[in-house]
Amino acid sequence: MKQVKSVNFRELDKKVKEYWKKENTYKKVKALNEHGPEYYFVDGPPYCSGAIHLGTAWNKIIKDTVLRFKRIQGYNVLDKAGWDMHGLPIEVKVENEFNIGSKKDIETKIGTQEFINKCKEFALNHLGHMQGQFENLGVWLDFENAYMPIKRDYMEMGWWTLKKAHEKELLTKDLRSGYWCPRCETSLAEHEVRGEYKEVLDPSVYVKFKLEKSDEYITIWTTTPWTLPSNMLVCVNPEFDYAYVNVEFENGTAETWIIAEKLVNDVMKKAEKNNDISKFSISKVVKGDSLIGLKYIHPLLEENEKQQEFAKIENVHTIVPGDHVTLEGGTGLVHTAPGFGEDDFNIGKEHNIPVYAPIDDNGKYTDSIWKGTFVKDMDESVIETLISKNLLVNSGKVKHTYPHCWRCKTPLLFRATEQWFLSISKIKDSIIEQGKTVDWVPDWVKTRYVNGVSFVGDWNISRQRYWGIPLPIWICEECGNYEVIGSVDELKERANEKDVDLSDIHKPAVDKITLTCSCGGKMKRTPDVLDVWYDSGLAPYASIGSKKLKKAQFITEGNDQVTKWFYSQHALSAVVFDDTSYEKCMMHGFTLDETGEKMSKSLGNIVSPDDVTEQYGADVLRFYLLSANKAWEDLRFSYSEMDETRSMLNTLWNSYAFSANYMVLDDFVPNNEYFKHVKDEDAWILSRINTVAKEAVEALEKPHLHVYTWALRDFILNDFSRWYIKLIRDRTWMEKNDVQKLSAYQTLYYVIMKLISIMAPVTPHLSEEIYQNLKTEDMPESIFMNKLTIESEFINETLEKDTEIIREIVDSILKGRDKAKYTLRYPITKITLPENIAETVEKYGYIIKEQGNVKEIELKEFEGNITVKPNFKELGKIFRSDVPKVVAAINSVAPNELKEKLKSGNFEVSEYEIKPEYVEFRVEIPENIVGVEFSKGNVYINIEMNDEVIKEGLVREVVRRIQSMRKDMDLDINEKINVKLEGIDFSSDYLSHIANEVRGNFVESLKSDYNQKWTIKTPNEETYDISIDIEKNK
């Protein structure tokens, strides 16, 4: 054990990390627990696409805290780190780096192989940087054996999983309308789009379509005018009422428009802005059912020759029923383009309508006069065309939310394309039931998860990209039959090309392989790659190379992952193993700035974890992030709260330094024999630290990390530093071998060692540093090789409750002193406490006297002047009009007598039964008394002062100032000094006491090394001008 000085947490971090690295501590801990019970954790993989942000840091700190806790419980923790390395996040970054604007550029400018190489290089480079950032936070994970989806064995597991899905008839290829990114030129799954809706300003267009066999018009509303050239149907709700609106124009002409009756006024109000309408009226109202089957003339028939061909097909350009039609806006008639919307697609399929989606992968039209034009660039031109044909009812703008690409942030299109799907709809009910068996933290996430899954459709797993796991599906060019390959060995066996290097099965190498179909035709691989969420969904078993289900005992990610990663891994496990892949799942919130804004470069409010740890050290950030609020709530990052956390840890360090330095001074060697001599306050802190340990273990098991850290903070600040250290400070000044001193040291030693064992998961650096200084030769070399234990025999609930009362009393005395401006250095002659706590006060009254600086404690009811106040609210409920008579009866009894009578229960006066709740007793307190309420009654403090009180207070004033001067002079604890005091005359007894407290000798003359002058003002307004000289005792 060595002397301890002040701490710099950042320097401490570095020192401890160097120690761990030199001693290979992480691996030693792993080896130590190798035969312990297994604890399986799956790391939700971050994308290797840049530096970590505060949310990523929070995520890894949560994981590291839980896993460190499990290690000190003796578990053999499977803790592989994981990385997301495929997909659009990486591709978009590489495209930006090489100024690539399209997939065509990839193939013509640098080539597929070079692009794949650059993606791999980018991912690996950022992996190394991000790993260093995680390690800087003190994170212990198995980074050496981290799972990487770009490795062949992991990719093969994706193939094996997909073959299992195929064998279970859960894999299908189908033409469906879904999300399409025109910038990335690929389809997206619905779970990738959740949370990616942004507010946009789009056209709001009302259009009229002329009915084929009459001069009447149906009206529709759309925010995507560009889809009108692809219109195939119009939907109505058969149950709604539709009005035939006679519209008269200023030029004397008239038309009939068909609009849902409830929306007529809204639509006509808009129509009047763009048309010279003189008046309108409803001529008749019909049910939507009567409109079904009516044919209309496509509004852009002349501009799109393809529509002229479609017009010859039965049911095309026809009004059909649709349950999705509502009256929440629009016209009650819905424009339907089966190539550009899920509802539209399903309606079209139901009525055998061709799926017409005339746009290419870049979102440009392939038919009509707008051929070659990007869809969003068509809007104004389509509107102008409708105006020229007198078919526009109204044109405006509307703000609404619209889905965007989750990586490049481009507005998405709804487009019908052929894709590969996992048929989740067949097993959705099983997924929901399995999800209910998971231990969700917090428990309400279960409802959110189940509700989210209930709305999912089949999973679109194919992506028209490059950097990903290639779909292991080969399709025959002759008969269209397809086969799913489940491993590289199977592919080698079936391959026509035997010389292709398959050590890496990314594109384009795997595309060179052809198979022979049973019909004799050539089979080529479908060019698509798997959804990157499929990659991470494989993690529970692919990360450990197992084809058997191994349920994770703990996973945690941010709240955006509830229907993303939590879902993707569950869905794949359900497909392959018919079960969920995790037992306990914790959701955490997002990190925001101090005002609650999302952090972003544009707002300039991003907080870098590296910058924070450089300023504060990793442990301060770790403790702050886990204690700022409940983990599942969004966290508003605050530097002032970081300062408070640092201050709290500094308080712990100072308490440790105080303890260690005195122990070193007295050559203290820990020995459990000293526990035989513990005092009440020692027994209390021993009980408290084990109670805290118990609470911490319970909280970490859940895990409720806020409960864990709040318990630690409260113990450090209130129990240990502000209470126990104060109680035993005087014992550290006793003779070297005094048993009271030794038992205090033994208690301090035990408490600090136990405390850092509890804190080690959240403050690993600080805990290790203290442990290294305090450990004895027979102890393990690292704190993380110790097991966290709870000594239940130390726990004494009665003692803790009694001490809590004593602390309340002391706090009340301090409040009373503040009220009376009566500083703690001046003794109080007497306090009066209620008799109901006599037993507790008789046992521990000495603590009240020491900590409150009180000379005498009196246990009795305070004898002030008692007055009675009737409780009119309660009396009114019972006695109503008799209340005045009851009040008179109450006032007829002396207050002291009434109070005594009511102690026994109800009391009858003038035929009225008086209950305790009918009255309130108040005590009038004399000027020399201050009363303060606490949970068991009131503390009454006598604030009268006499000469003895003043002298004792002045003694403390002088001691404090000499101690302050010693600190200024940087003197060792035990270093003797000579003191000369002027301005106050003390008796020899008082001078002897001061000398003992400050390690000094009072002398008449000295060669001053340091002089200070003060003016001391006592509570009774006396003033003393003093001068103190100190000479080092050479």
Swiss-Prot record:
ATP binds at K601. It catalyses: tRNA(Ile) + L-isoleucine + ATP = L-isoleucyl-tRNA(Ile) + AMP + diphosphate. Belongs to the class-I aminoacyl-tRNA synthetase family. IleS type 2 subfamily. The gene is ileS. This is Isoleucine--tRNA ligase. It comes from Methanococcus maripaludis (strain DSM 14266 / JCM 13030 / NBRC 101832 / S2 / LL). Its main location: cytoplasm. It is found in: Cytoplasm. A motif ('KMSKS' region) lies at residues 598-602. PROSITE patterns: AA_TRNA_LIGASE_I (PS00178). Its cofactor is Zn(2+). Its EC number is 6.1.1.5. Keywords: Aminoacyl-tRNA synthetase, ATP-binding, Cytoplasm, Ligase, Metal-binding, Nucleotide-binding, Protein biosynthesis, Zinc. IleRS has two distinct active sites: one for aminoacylation and one for editing. The misactivated valine is translocated from the active site to the editing site, which sterically excludes the correctly activated isoleucine. The single editing site contains two valyl binding pockets, one specific for each substrate (Val-AMP or Val-tRNA(Ile)). A motif ('HIGH' region) lies at residues 46-56. GO terms for cellular component: cytoplasm. Pfam families: Anticodon_1, DUF5915, tRNA-synt_1. Catalyzes the attachment of isoleucine to tRNA(Ile). As IleRS can inadvertently accommodate and process structurally similar amino acids such as valine, to avoid such errors it has two additional distinct tRNA(Ile)-dependent editing activities. One activity is designated as 'pretransfer' editing and involves the hydrolysis of activated Val-AMP. The other activity is designated 'posttransfer' editing and involves deacylation of mischarged Val-tRNA(Ile). Monomer. GO terms for biological process: isoleucyl-tRNA aminoacylation. One of its GO terms (molecular function) is zinc ion binding.
